[in-house]
Amino acid sequence: MEQTRIQMFEQQIYPEIFAEVAGNVMDRFGKQKKEIIEEWETILQQYMDQLADLQEEEEAPSIQEIDFSFLYTSLEDKHAKFQIDSYGEGGRVSGESILTEYISADWIADGAKVLAERLAERAEQENLRGYVRAAEIDKLRLRAVRSLLLCLAVRFKYIIRDMIDFRSLARVQKEPCFLIQIGEYMDWMKTIYAVQPAVDIFNCEQDTDLRFRSFHAIHYNEKQFKAFNLSQSDFRDCVFTESSITDCLMNDCMFDGCVFERLCIESTMMKGCIFANCVFQETIMKEIVLSESDKESSILDYFAPAEFHNCEFREVRLENCNADNCIVKNCDASKLGLENSSIVGSGFEERKDKEGQDELF
């Protein structure tokens, strides 16, 4: 009987309370984002400069990995915090941290505290206090902290570049594969920034990790991109002609100054992508996901809507695409057609309202 009551509390009541608290924590994170970025930027700049100084004095090797690790033990301290560590070749599994620093994470601790209080209140209301004791609530509090960290990790990827002083980072000697990660101390880590060696998509080993790559001034002519995971890669001044992109993962990619001509992009995930100064010519997008729908969105797996800035659309069609809430600024097109595509809350919708038709601009 006791175990059944506890399971009911964990499976029905905890998720409800966690969703509410997590939403509040994410709202607070969003409202305080500027202050959080400034705090992290200051500490990370000092940290990078210290690393570079150690390297100049030949007291530190080149760096492969910098980790932001949440310390569960700090939940009992006055201020919860992340520990910043850096590691040489092989990362954290191959050696000790070269330099350690700390940065506050009070918003996580505050959220965990509120959650524990609400769980205790709800247990009292449901006459379950005799079953859901302090130890059980503390276990759920720690579970919530892990989930909150996952929530934050998928959002940090969008602000980490604002936190980094790239001049300080440039001083640091880095391994060819360099990562910045966030997660739990001595546990899981999620990569939020990376510098990877150059790679040829169509001339590399089959198991090559194509994420976080940079592709500059490459002409892809009559190429078939099939089932590639190119998420968070950077395409600059690339040209795609007479080619196809099918069943690919391209979430959070950056396309700057790229040309897409006589191209078919189909069944591909492009959530969080930024298209800047791009030209789309005689291109069809079929069943492309540019943003998450309300049904698909998850607080634990967050993607920003795609953005289009200073782009040109010429003889382009979006068929059965999801482009809700996509940002469209300073874009010019001779013809952009929409067929069974969702554009609620996006810049495409605003322009459609002005024109009053599916063929925009």
What residue ranges belong to the model's regions?
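Amphipathic, interaction-prone secondary-structure segments
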Residues: M48-G88, Q173-Q196
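Intrinsically disordered, low-complexity regulatory segments enriched in Ser/Thr/Pro
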Residues: S74-R129
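Elongated scaffolding segments in large macromolecular assemblies
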Residues: K139-I218, E222-K223, F228
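N-terminal alpha-helical "arm" segments
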Residues: M1-G23
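Short N-terminal edge-element motif at the start of the domain
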Residues: E16-I63
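Tandem repeat scaffolds
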Residues: A194-F361
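Compositionally biased, intrinsically disordered linkers/stalks adjacent to structured regions
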Residues: R118-L152
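Short, flexible N-terminal segments of the mature chain
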Residues: S86-L99, R141, F225-D237, L300
